[in-house]
Amino acid sequence: MIPPASSTPPGEAVIPSVAPQDFWRSPISSYSGSVTGHISHRANNFKRHPKRRKYIRPSPPPPPNTPCPIELVDFGDLHPQRSFWELLFNGCILFGIEFSYAMETAYVTPVLLQMGLPDQLYSLVWFISPILGFLLQPLLGAWSDRCTSRFGRRRPFILVLAIGALLGLSLLLNGRDIGMALADTATNHKWGILLTVCGVVLMDFSADSADNPSHAYMMDVCGPVDQDRGLNIHALMAGLGGGFGYVVGGIHWDKTSFGRALGGQLRVIYVFTAITLSVTTVLTLISIPERPLRPLGEKRTAMKSPSLPLPPSPPVLLEEGAGDALPSTTATSLYASFSSPISPPSPLTPKYGSFISRDSSLTGINEFASSFGTSNIDSVLIDCFTAGHDNYLALPSSVPRQAISVSFPRAPDGFYCQERGLERREGPLTLGSDGDVLRVGSLDTSKPRASGILKRPQTLALPDVAGGNGPETSRRRNVTFSQQVANILLNGVKYESELTGSSEQSEQPLSLRHLCSTIYNMPKALRNLCVNHFLGWLSFEGMLLFYTDFMGEVVFQGDPKAPHTSEAYQKYNSGVTMGCWGMCIYAFSAAFYSAILEKLEECLSVRTLYFIAYLAFGLGTGLATLSRNLYVVLSLCTTYGILFSTLCTLPYSLLCDYYQSKKFAGSSADGTRRGMGVDISLLSCQYFLAQILVSLVLGPLTSAVGSANGVMYFSSLVSFLGCLYSSLCVTYEIPSVDAADEERQPLLLNV
């Protein structure tokens, strides 16, 4: 017969006792109604049909939501989904930079040639800036990875580089006037040439270097889904900025009253560019908040494993006289607080990760586990089956000793007071005179581990300690793997090191030796991607830096060194202006292609998109040298935008995919962890390396050929070479070895 529920016995010590037959049943007079609500319908059947209790095994109740204190959870790696406007404002800096860069590429070569710079030397103007970028770009990237400014890691670099670009632009477009104010004459522009070259170097280096922290800024504050959208929006803004820049440069401002009031063509361009760059920089800096990085010496709050209670179980009967007596009402409220959820359900929904339980009762665990990385959770799940029994419940000799893992939340400090007859105790709680111990603690304590992998889920045994020696007095409670997760998920120290490893900077200080080691030990996939990126920029920069000169000399048959009143000089100026409109077509085609690139990625593979971009550019530059028809040459500019959009998007998207592999990202434990800022800088260094080679080769090549046709031939040939390399050598997917190993674990089949 099932005895009726009665008041708590006076000998109860910490938690109330129950009769053995009511092991899964809460006493009506001692427990809150919320506890009984957890009992499943099968347990209710058990109570309604006591004679059939041998054949109906009660289901264990579901665990509560994960009671993890919110202040101990580091949500730095969790990013909310960004809106379109946030991503748009975040990419505004690309609009301003490309607007400025359009002015530079359109007017640097004509301005320097008109000031008397020899043909053999004007290509070397582009040589100094890429040298500085190639040497300093990795250092800037590594520095930004470790920057501890309260404004964030990337935004201080964006601000400084934007200011540098504005100063360089001021010297570039006003160098001739400043030189005339110093000591230049109408036939000697040595000061003007020097100031213009300095402006080109500063402007080019700052504008190109600002791309890297802007990309890293977006990747830091966005999740994986928003990163692809952000890269496409960045390419879109870059294309629009270049397009509007070439539109402004292609207008004859000298013929307008506004241009005459400001002092000429270059003055109007300078005013437009300075305002655009300043406004877009401010919009980017205030777009999305950036979390500051903790200094190396600052100790972060350790996120220990939350004290996860077992599914609400009947309290364990303690021996009479063991410990201090506790009033029944106090013990009841204490147990109710232990068994009730103390954290609100997480608003996060499981989207990623292999740990998503099919048990609907594990809602809190699912939400908490899905908010962290898959590798972290899966590594903890494997520990479920490799760890040994660590806590034991000591019982009288008449009862078999069974292993149990009990984890209760700590009672608040205000609970321990003399009025309630309970004092704070450190360490295990001693019960009885025979030395038996009941350890009631949390998973925060260090626990020894046993070796070996179990081939089946472990079983938690909850003994029935209240009665005799029959088979039902030591009935085992079988708990499935999903329910054990509620007790052993988030194993303290190991989980903390895994969680903080990806978000905190490496303990190794920044040095040139460490940077060189990172470059030397570059993974093969990244090395091939860098080579392919180099070939793309080598072909593109050759066309971009000399396109307006190509239009003026080849298409319009002009001469930049002819007298200013001659027809040849006027033809050359008309060709430069028309070249600006050609670059405008290229820029808007890049913006359009960037807008549809996300849809194309759903239909075509990244390998195919790479192949199409290189092939289209090679055909476009090659056919431009074979035709003198202005409309044909301008229409071919659309192919240039396809390659530009590809170079601004796909390499960084592949790099993000590479970082999903633990093998590629490395580990802080063995010193192989890579930094996103450094690897983005390594990709960007290929742009500088390509510009260095263009500066060294294309000047003599143009002199040897006799026109700018040689530049277009060179760009077409390199583009076809990149087309082959992207198809044969680039790695587009790194197999996740770790994930495959975890999936082969038989234990995960019980989730």
From Swiss-Prot:
Membrane topology category: Multi-pass membrane protein
GO BP of this protein: D-glucose transmembrane transport; galactose transmembrane transport
Gene this protein is translated from: Slc45a1
Phosphothreonine carried by residues: T500
Gene3D superfamilies assigned: MFS general substrate transporter like domains (1.20.1250.20)
Role noted for this protein: Proton-associated glucose transporter in the brain.
Record's keyword annotation contains Magnesium: no
Name of the protein: Proton-associated sugar transporter A
KW Transport (keyword) present: yes
Organism: Mus musculus (Mouse)
